Structure formats: C-alpha cells, structure tokens
C-alpha cells in the first residue's frame, strides 16, 4: 500500500459543531494518523497520513454531506507521507 499525506481545508459551518471530533473518529476508524485544526478564518484544516485508499475514503466522507455542521467546499493537497503523527489529534 502506498503511504500518503492528505491535507484538506474544509470551508462552511464547521467550527463549534463537533466537526473535528467527527473527523477524528472517522480517521481512527480508517487507521489514519494526523490532526484536525480550527483556523482563524473559520475553516478546519485536516491533515491525515496513511494508506492512500484510507485517505481517499476520508476525503469522500468529508464531502459526503453526512458531517456535523455544513461543508461548503473541500480543497485537497496530496504530498508524501512524513510519519510525523502518532494518533489523531483535535487542535
């Protein structure tokens, strides 16, 4: 399996609604490590590392319409796996 890093910036009503907690739970179910962080501009930045297929599934879930709050858009960037996380944090 190819290991990758997914960075996704999620825009919408995603702060103060349990979005980071929900993202962490989905990421851990998929065996991913990383973090979900509130940004000052109202977005949430999701960084996930692990198997490409698991990261792709997390991205699908972020765009599914089944998240807490309301997701208006998700911008993604794929880079090399760095191995810099243990577990998945809410920041």
From Swiss-Prot:
PROSITE patterns: ACYLPHOSPHATASE_1 (PS00150), ACYLPHOSPHATASE_3 (PS51160). Residues 5-91 form the Acylphosphatase-like domain. It comes from the Bacteria. The active site is at residues 20, 38. GO terms for molecular function: acylphosphatase activity. Keywords: Hydrolase. Disulfide bonds: none annotated. The keyword Hydrolase applies. This is Acylphosphatase.
């Amino acid at each position: 399996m190819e290991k990758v890093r997914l960075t996704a910036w999620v825009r919408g009503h995603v702060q103060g609604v349990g979005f980071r907690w929900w993202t962490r739970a989905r990421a851990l179910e998929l065996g991913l490590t990383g973090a979900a962080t509130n940004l000052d501009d109202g977005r949430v930045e999701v960084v996930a590392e692990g198997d490409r297929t698991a990261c792709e599934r997390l991205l699908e879930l972020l765009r599914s319409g089944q998240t807490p709050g309301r997701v208006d858009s998700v911008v993604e960037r794929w880079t090399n796996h760095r191995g810099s996380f243990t577990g998945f944090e809410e920041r």
